[in-house]
Structures are given as C-alpha cells and as structure tokens.
C-alpha cells in the first residue's frame, strides 16, 4: 500500500483517535488535488481494520485485502453519471449495504473521493447514514474544499485540511526510499 508522507499532525490525530477508541464515524479530508487524500484514507482504514498487534501490521488478512483492493468491508465509491458526480442509485446501494454488518471485521467503510461534484440531492440521501451510522459504519469524503459538502453533512463529520508536503518531508521520504534528496 502506498505510504502517506507529511501532515504529521493529522496522522498523529487519526492514530490517537483510534488508540483511544474515539474515532468519529465520518471524515472530510480536503485540500488541493494530488496531495494524497485517498492515500491518507487508506492508511486510516488500514489502522482501523488491522487485526495485528502493531497497527497497521501490513501482514494480517485485513491489511493484505485492503492493500490488494479486495477488502469486503471497504468500498471506494466511484463517480458515475454525466456530471462526474455520484448517482442516486449508487448512494442508495451504499445505504442498503450499510444496514448489513461487516463481513470480516468490526467496521464497514465507504470512501467517497473527489466530492466536489456531489450534488445536493445525493448529499441529502447520504445525510441520515452519516448522521446516524451503525456502530460499525465509517464514511470518508475527499474534496478540494469543505464547501463542496452541505453544511448539514459537514456538521456531522470531522474536517481535516491536508497540506502540501514540505521540502524537508519530501527529502525524508526520498531518503527513506533510498534516493538522494538532492
């Protein structure tokens, strides 16, 4: 699975939420395109779903399925329709799926990437699920701006601003992979 670099405070906050069993059931990761918001979502989900002692371990069944993109309790909801948004039918499927318990672990997770084009009707359909998810239900939205989501949706999730990687963080990431940072 791809490594997420930078934004140490966000990574620490997410880790602490999970350690203390205080993770909210909804997040919005927002920031410029190309910052790794979906990678951050995968990293969070790996830690949430991991069954190993050191989370994420990368070697348990859950970590391997997530890395391979076949975890039955994780759905990366795809855009559909003419306007590159999310279809009403897709959101209804998510709501129906959410009603059944997880297949493999203790959580079911839905990642809605690039929500800038998510229309009002679709967001309103999701509102009840986001507002009152079952104990095992988690939602992660990514967007370039928090204004992409309705205030009613935003008020029920935790919004975290993802920043560009600093030069120092970039050099450290290159060095970690065996490249000269110069």
Locate the predicted segments by residue.
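Catalytic acidic motif of RecA-like/P-loop NTPases
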Residues: 99, 113-119, 124-131, 147
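Long, charge-dense, solvent-exposed interaction surfaces that engage phosphate-rich ligands
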Residues: 156-182
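Small/polar loops that bind or transfer phosphate-bearing groups
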Residues: 6, 114, 141-142, 162
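A short alpha->loop->secondary-structure connector
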Residues: 93, 129-136, 159
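Helix-turn-helix-type domain boundary/helix-start signal
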Residues: 3-4, 84, 116, 160, ...
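Sensor-1/coupling segment of RecA-like P-loop NTPase cores
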Residues: 118, 133-150
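Short regulatory helix/loop adjacent to the ATP-binding pocket of P-loop NTPases
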Residues: 125-130, 145-158, 174-175
């Amino acid at each position: 699975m791809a490594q997420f670099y930078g934004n140490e405070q966000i990574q620490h906050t997410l880790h602490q939420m999970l350690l203390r069993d205080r993770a909210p059931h909804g997040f919005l990761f927002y920031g410029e395109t190309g910052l790794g918001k979906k990678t951050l979502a995968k990293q969070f989900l790996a830690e949430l779903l991991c069954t190993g002692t050191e989370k994420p371990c990368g070697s348990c069944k859950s970590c391997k399925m997530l890395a391979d993109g076949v975890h039955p309790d994780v759905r990366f909801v795809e855009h559909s329709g003419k306007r590159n948004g999310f279809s009403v039918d897709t959101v209804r499927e998510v709501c129906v799926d959410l009603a059944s318990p997880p297949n493999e672990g203790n959580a079911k997770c839905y990642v809605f990437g690039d929500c800038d084009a998510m229309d009002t009707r679709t967001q309103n359909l999701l509102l009840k699920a986001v507002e009152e998810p079952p104990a095992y239900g988690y939602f992660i939205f990514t967007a370039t701006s928090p204004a992409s989501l309705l205030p009613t949706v935003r008020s029920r999730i935790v919004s975290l601003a993802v920043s560009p990687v600093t030069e120092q963080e970039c050099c450290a990431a290159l060095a970690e992979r065996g490249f000269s940072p110069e």
